[in-house]
Design a protein with these regions (language model features):
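Substrate-binding/active-site clefts of carbohydrate-active enzymes
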Residues: 2-5, 9-16, 24-26, 30-157, ...
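Short catalytic-loop micro-motif centered on adjacent basic/acidic residues
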Residues: 3-5, 162-167
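Outer-membrane beta-barrel proteins
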Residues: 169-172
């Protein structure tokens, strides 16, 4: 599969160039995270500090634009892959392990203990401690339900698949986590 990664492109701009993407022989397009962000700036990293598990942000586009993109891409046989951020939320600008004030209050109950990772060569620390942002307890059943609802909504819009950001920071099933099984 030939995947074109259109990092930070607006959904409407991608939709407009679908015929050209097909002409160039691509089978899929990976889009940037479409979750809410802590402000409307254009810095790339804002997309990787989500405030919610909802579709739409000022940088990439709205849910309606995602549906239009998926419909247009589908008509050309092109799959849409959405980059998603589920391990952490946006941090406060000064206290990075504290959630930003714009983080969805419903998600705050799913935050993990705010202990910083001090050894990135220690697998347990990388999968159970914070890596510079407020981290979610991805093994919490309530959080998993929220994630599943979000992914189902993306699939209903026509998204074909996902790229999961920070995958190395999730424990595997053989390490006692069922999170990745819930996603599949």
């Amino acid at each position: 599969m030939k995947i074109l990664h259109l990092f930070q492109w607006k959904l409407g701009d991608i939709t407009a160039c679908i015929p050209k993407v097909k002409e160039q022989g691509f089978d899929a397009i990976q889009i940037s995270p479409i979750q809410g962000t802590k402000d409307n700036g254009d810095a790339w990293w804002l997309l990787y500090q989500p405030t919610n598990l909802k579709i739409g942000n000022s940088q990439i586009g709205a849910k309606e634009e995602l549906i239009s993109l998926c419909n247009a891409a589908n008509s050309y046989g092109i799959k849409i892959i959405c980059d998603i951020v589920l391990r952490h939320c946006a941090g406060d600008n000064w206290e990075h392990l504290k959630p930003h004030r714009n983080v969805d209050p419903e998600l705050l109950q799913y935050l993990a203990e705010p202990t910083e990772c001090t050894d990135y060569c220690d697998r347990w620390q990388c999968t159970h401690r914070c890596t510079g942002m407020p981290m979610f307890d991805y093994n919490n059943v309530g959080f998993q339900k929220k994630v599943t609802e979000f992914l189902d909504e993306l699939l209903a819009c026509g998204v074909w698949g996902f790229r999961l950001d920070q995958l190395k920071h999730y424990a595997l099933p053989e390490e006692g986590s069922n999170f990745l099984n819930v996603l599949s």
